[in-house]
Regions:
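Metal-ion/cofactor- or nucleotide/acyl-coenzyme-handling active-site neighborhoods
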Residues: 2-283
């Protein structure tokens, strides 16, 4: 039985590896992310989950004394100007394809005028930034190309920036970018990932997915999210969750191979791939 399972696993990894090689050949572009971390310096990656509100209130000193990486609509929150993150990442196509969305337009307006400190913005390699960013914002590119297969192939793809674990959530490219920047210790906050608690199915068989954030989403964002999920079935959403949580284990394996320690500092987070450690006392 174990021999058959091993043979099956080998062919499965072979197929995944070939598929990944083809994807990288077609989709990957040159990236320009270089190590910048000082020796012993730790990075805090901030998801936008509801727990981030408590983290900001209870860990102001840690947040002020570490480089921060923010994601998605965080720049539209009032707290953003206080946090002054050095790094920012956008991955969802909505940020580059829909300037009719008031929240997206406000995001780019903020990148143009609100950032008064040096910041590096990471965006997918193939997108076109729809507006001119401010003088303090430096743009760098990453490849959001999902790579699966043999560990040696994944390691080469991840290390060269040609690909990453399947990026079903912005936190995946965020952590991988932190590793590429040379940080040997990474803390993750605001990564509740408790989406399954908010899933519902209406009497019309419409899946309702509420994804709360530390900031209050306006009605336009609720409408946009509802339209995205309008024709998606529950099994598709659950599979997406599966892919995201599995990707964290790929990150953990790769991080271990690079001597990088990733701590999940999000209270009650559903991510089970990384050891837990409170942000208080972060080195």
């Amino acid at each position: 039985m174990s021999i058959g399972k091993n043979i099956s696993g080998f062919f499965e990894k072979s197929a995944s590896s070939l598929k990944s090689l083809a994807k990288m050949a077609i989709q990957s572009r040159r990236c320009d992310i270089k190590p910048v971390a000082a020796p012993g310096e730790s990075l805090i990656v901030m998801g936008n989950g509801p727990s981030l509100a408590d983290t900001m209130r209870d860990n102001a000193e840690a947040l002020a004394s570490h480089p921060l990486l923010a994601v998605n609509f965080a720049i539209n929150a009032p707290e953003f100007l206080e946090l002054r993150p050095e790094f920012y990442i956008l991955a969802d196509p909505v940020f580059f394809n829909d300037l009719t969305n008031a929240n997206v337009r406000r995001l780019w307006d903020n990148f143009s005028s609100a950032v008064t400190w040096p910041m590096t913005l990471f965006v997918p390699a193939k997108v076109r930034i729809p507006v001119k960013t401010g003088a303090n914002v430096t743009v760098r590119r990453f490849n959001p190309v999902g790579v699966e297969g043999f560990a040696w192939l994944e390691n080469i793809a991840f290390r060269t920036g040609a690909g990453m674990p399947r990026p079903r959530n912005v936190l995946i490219p965020a952590i991988m970018t932190g590793i590429a920047l040379g940080f040997k210790t990474i803390y993750i906050v605001g990564a509740d990932h408790s989406w399954s608690k908010t899933l519902e199915v209406s009497d019309e068989n419409v899946v309702i997915s509420v994804q709360p954030h530390f900031y209050k989403d306006n009605e336009a964002e609720h409408t946009r999210v509802a339209s995205v999920y309008k024709n998606i079935r529950l099994h598709e959403i659950m599979y997406s969750f599966y892919v995201a949580f599995r990707s964290y284990f790929s990150i953990r394996r790769y991080a271990d191979s690079r001597g990088v320690t990733i701590y999940n500092s999000t209270p009650s987070s559903f991510i089970d791939a990384f050891p837990r450690r409170p942000l208080k006392g972060a080195s």
